[in-house]
Amino acid sequence: MDKLLIRGGKPLNGPIRVSGSKNAALPILLAAPLLTEKTVVDNVPRLRDIHTTLKLNEILGCPSTFEGNTVTMEPAANLNPEAPYDLVRTMRASVLVLGPLLARTGRARVALPGGCAIGARPVNLHLTALEKMGATFTLEAGYIEGRCDRLTGAHIVFDFPTVGGTENLLMAASLAEGTTILENAAREPEVADLADFLNAMGAKITGHGTSVITIEGVPSLGGGRYSVMPDRIEAATYMIAAAITGGELHLECCPFMELDAVVSKLREMGVVIEATNAGVAVRRQGQLVGVDVATQVYPGFPTDVQAQIMALMCVAVGSSSIRETIFENRFMHVQELVRLGAQIRISSQTAFIRGVGTLTGAPVMASDLRASASLVLAGLAAKGETLIQRVYHLDRGYEAMEVKLQNVGADIERLT
């Protein structure tokens, strides 16, 4: 099992290119069963979850090739409507095949999903919405089995602005009969990117990026070429890397406009962030100071950056707090940061952080994707050596992270 060894205390300086968004690429690739023509998707990050998705698509009957950062998907000759447990158990996003399979075949049998163990992310919001379009579901032997005649348009109001639920319904409704209206829909840029992709393939979707989305069903979707948006979570992580090490990074292909909430909090802490012709320049100016953060759905502060900014708070002057409002049980990185010398106290869904002068390297263990990024950031700032175990979590969401960090001056190596 791979590990990362970091010798910290070195400022990072230089350019880093932000990769394509994992959270945008996954639903775009999982839309493969909807397509009837060859489709080329560019700027796809080479990640473990992407490879799992392409394996799943192949089992469903949608073959593809992955060269560089380009995926070429061929249309399915015969769709297999079953997503097996062996693949689905490793990746929660795989539940997104429900909508496309029901829309194309009238049947879907999908194992209950796995992925990061950061609390319940119930799929009932997906199922309830699809039922309003005419699908019926049973749960048997760990599988969700759905059936329908042709899906029909419906007016759906989500109880919560679910990202996965909105994406599933965008895909299902694209081939439904009639018009579907989604209220309280997720506004995340990755949801809008999926809608833009579907429109490029022939769908008729409007309102994406707002809380009310309208989808007019079409008989079929074709193919084409599309480029995935840059990864705003990766960009935020490297912004924090510049700040926590006291260096200056220049982020290329940075989705600056989608990072308002993160940029605002980092500036409040004393981080200088400037848009340039080449991207975004990030550096620390003087002492970092503590702030209070509450995670929110977009356009609020993203839960996927909660663990990373906590690492930064650990070395800031004064007190900080983070209230996690999206997921329960997403503070599993706290005990590992404490091993590095951080002072953190948890009360219910809020973490209270008192900044310390320096962190000290120690062996730590990653518990999930963003927790692993938090430990890398802390290790970059810590004195001495930090050994991070279970970095397979990191490989699910960050493309060649140690290589990118090495190129800007980090002393980091992968041990196999």
Curated annotation (Swiss-Prot):
The modification 2-(S-cysteinyl)pyruvic acid O-phosphothioketal is found at residue 116. The active site is at residue 116. Pathway: Cell wall biogenesis; peptidoglycan biosynthesis. Its EC number is 2.5.1.7. It comes from the Bacteria. GO terms for molecular function: UDP-N-acetylglucosamine 1-carboxyvinyltransferase activity. Pfam families: EPSP_synthase. One of its GO terms (cellular component) is cytoplasm. UDP-N-acetyl-alpha-D-glucosamine binds at residues 92, 304, 326. Belongs to the EPSP synthase family. MurA subfamily. This is UDP-N-acetylglucosamine 1-carboxyvinyltransferase. It comes from Solidesulfovibrio magneticus (strain ATCC 700980 / DSM 13731 / RS-1) (Desulfovibrio magneticus).
